[in-house]
């Protein structure tokens, strides 16, 4: 090889290396699209490595780079191999993550899969978590929909709600007679798609609502129509220990439409001692406060502030301790990539111990499985 040819190749290699380094650096000013990109089900939005724009997080075994980061909430990291100058890598699971077993199949930590057409699942450190691909099946139909039922749609996986249109008028007339509504209240019922409460009617007719409904005048409604605000009580926490979810249904919104609200809840930490703190002669430890301020965690992100939450204790006589009074706090969370979001979190004020246990007594079964629970752990 002649010296001129060698110099030409050396210059070409140098220029290529400089070009790659230039592409790997972050821009001086961020230029992002006005609307955030729409990601596939189960794929979250994260900020790129430069902290500029929101992008769809790369999943297991997908190509990644500084501008296309992996989904850290699923324990994924961009693996560039042994090369220190590589610009692209492959999303791999962190080494400490455990695989999952689901339907006699093994999935790697961070791997996403679709067991059926209605769910998208992900293996996260030995536990399988799924999100529904048919959210309309989980939402509540309008109360103005008589005899609602889910029906299969030809060529589609998800079922849809249908109403008996022919019986709408008869159904509303029956409600009017039952509740003794006047003409204005009948119109209110139709417009709000809620069963209105007439004057002097008994709240026992609506046992699902724990508090007395209130009337809201909303200027956003046509002609200043009234909205009878109704909200159910919060459901029990989905977990007896560790982080769970509590839900309720309300129409307290500008549209006066029934929606489901959720909040994060933790009745007690899973590692909380059961009997060590009991005084002599005592059989229950009702309410315990965290000995020091802690940060709440959710989906790999931590609360911005520290809190000293109260937890429910345990009993040795077969009773169970559950929250008696709670309040809901809107909490700010920060992720490793700088992303921030808010979530409603349950804060326990007091607990009670009784024999009316919603699940086996925590004294002997501190961990329990929900109906149709898909979590399966491996050592």
Swiss-Prot record:
Which subcellular locations apply to this protein? Answer: Secreted
Which residues are annotated with the PTM Phosphoserine? 184
- May I ask which residue range the UniProt record assigns to the signal sequence? 1-24
Query: SUPFAM superfamilies under this entry?
Result: FnI-like domain, Growth factor receptor domain, TSP-1 type 1 repeat
Q: Where is the TSP type-1 domain?
A: 226-271
Q: Where is the IGFBP N-terminal domain?
A: 25-94
Q: Which Cys pairs does UniProt list as disulfide-bonded?
A: 26-50, 30-52, 32-53, 39-56, 64-78, 70-91, 284-321, 301-335, 312-351, 315-353, 320-357
Q: What is its main location?
A: secreted
Q: What induces it?
A: By growth factors.
UniProt domain CTCK: residue ranges: 284-358
Kindly give the InterPro entries that the UniProt entry links to this protein.
Answer: CCN, Cys_knot_C, Glyco_hormone_CN, Growth_fac_rcpt_cys_sf, IGFBP-like, IGFBP_CNN, Insulin_GF-bd_Cys-rich_CS, TSP1_CCN
**Biological-process GO terms, alphabetical:** apoptotic process; apoptotic process involved in heart morphogenesis; atrial septum morphogenesis; atrioventricular valve morphogenesis; cell adhesion; cell-cell adhesion; chemotaxis; chondroblast differentiation
Q: A GO molecular function for this record?
A: integrin binding
Could you tell me which residue ranges the VWFC domain spans? 98-164
The residue stretches assigned to a coiled coil in this entry are none
- Region annotation (Heparin-binding) maps to 277-313
Known tissue expression: Low in kidney, adrenal gland, testes, brain, and ovary, moderate in heart, uterus, and skeletal muscle, highest in lung.
GO cellular component terms, alphabetically, are: collagen-containing extracellular matrix; extracellular region
Gene3D superfamilies from the entry?
Complement Module, domain 1, Thrombospondin type-1 (TSP1) repeat
Pfam families referenced in this protein's UniProt entry, alphabetically: Cys_knot, IGFBP, TSP1_CCN, VWC
User: What keywords are annotated for this sequence in UniProt?
Assistant: Cell adhesion, Chemotaxis, Disulfide bond, Growth factor binding, Heparin-binding, Phosphoprotein, Secreted, Signal
**Which protein family is named in the record?**
Belongs to the CCN family.
**Summary of the function given for this chain in its UniProt record:** Promotes cell proliferation, chemotaxis, angiogenesis and cell adhesion. Appears to play a role in wound healing by up-regulating, in skin fibroblasts, the expression of a number of genes involved in angiogenesis, inflammation and matrix remodeling including VEGA-A, VEGA-C, MMP1, MMP3, TIMP1, uPA, PAI-1 and integrins alpha-3 and alpha-5. CCN1-mediated gene regulation is dependent on heparin-binding. Down-regulates the expression of alpha-1 and alpha-2 subunits of collagen type-1.
Quaternary state and interactors: Interaction with integrins is heparin- and cell-type-dependent and promotes cell adhesion.
What is the name listed in the Swiss-Prot or TrEMBL entry for this protein?
Answer: CCN family member 1
């Amino acid at each position: 090889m002649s010296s001129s040819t060698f110099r030409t190749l050396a210059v070409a290699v140098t220029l290529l290396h400089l070009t790659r380094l230039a592409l790997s650096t972050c821009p001086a000013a961020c230029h992002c699209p006005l609307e955030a990109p729409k990601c596939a089900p189960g794929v979250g939005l994260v900020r790129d490595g430069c902290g500029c724009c929101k992008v769809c997080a790369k999943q297991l075994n997908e190509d990644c780079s500084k501008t296309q980061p992996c989904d850290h909430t699923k324990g994924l990291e961009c693996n560039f191999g042994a090369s220190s100058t590589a610009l692209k890598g492959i999303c791999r699971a962190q080494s400490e993550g455990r695989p999952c077993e689901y339907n006699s199949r093994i999935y790697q930590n961070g791997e996403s899969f679709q067991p059926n057409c209605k769910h998208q699942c992900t293996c996260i450190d030995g536990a399988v978590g799924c999100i529904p691909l048919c959210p309309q099946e989980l939402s509540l139909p309008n109360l103005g929909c008589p005899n609602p039922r889910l029906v299969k749609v030809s060529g589609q996986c998800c079922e849809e709600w249908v109403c008996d249109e022919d019986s709408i008028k008869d159904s509303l007339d029956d409600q009017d007679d039952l509740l003794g509504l006047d003409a204005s209240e009948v119109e209110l019922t139709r417009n709000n798609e809620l069963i209105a409460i007439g004057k002097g009617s008994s709240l026992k007719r609506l046992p699902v609502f724990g508090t007395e409904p209130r009337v809201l005048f909303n200027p956003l409604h046509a002609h200043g129509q009234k909205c009878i605000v109704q909200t159910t009580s919060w459901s029990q926490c989905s977990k007896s220990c560790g982080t769970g979810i509590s839900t309720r249904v309300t129409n307290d919104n500008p549209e006066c439409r029934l929606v489901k609200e959720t909040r994060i809840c933790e009745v007690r930490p899973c590692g909380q001692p059961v009997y060590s703190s009991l005084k002599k002669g005592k059989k229950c430890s009702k309410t315990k406060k965290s000995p020091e301020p802690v940060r709440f965690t959710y989906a790999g992100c931590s609360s911005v502030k520290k809190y000293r939450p109260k937890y429910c204790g345990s009993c040795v006589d077969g009773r169970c301790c559950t929250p008696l009074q709670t309040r809901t706090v809107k909490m700010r969370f920060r992720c490793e990539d700088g992303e921030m979001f808010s979530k409603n979190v349950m804060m326990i004020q007091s607990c009670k111990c009784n024999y009316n246990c919603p699940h086996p007594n925590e004294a002997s079964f501190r961990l329990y499985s929900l109906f149709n629970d898909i979590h399966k752990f491996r050592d």
